[in-house]
């Protein structure tokens, strides 16, 4: 592996001997104007890796869409009807229309807004799921745009998120 194949953020971690999900010893100054939804914000003066490990918060989700028989779902036309979510401490299901025992919403817009608020509340370090990078993330982003919903699941206040599309290649899976 060559230096130009390692992202700048990863290079910073390597050069500063920072191990993600470790405990850290830091010197900070409090921020006067908050820019995130985090509990506290600080300007970092210095950092050193300490001992121990912090388990990352993971949120796994999957969507189901209403589709036409024999066709693949199209986010420009077919609504999301269910979003199932799972964390280590809870599971949640957002459903379009009345579904006993689950969080039900009269419109897709209301359901997607509730899901985005949930993602912000959970504030996951890792957002995962089956095929989310090749389907679910883009589908939700497209539906939000179509319905006029700000796609906000960032920790940054006022930041409208966007899905970054990347192409990968391996001998096993080919180009994706």
Predicted regions: what they are:
Residues 1-176:
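The two-metal-ion catalytic cores of nucleic-acid processing enzymes
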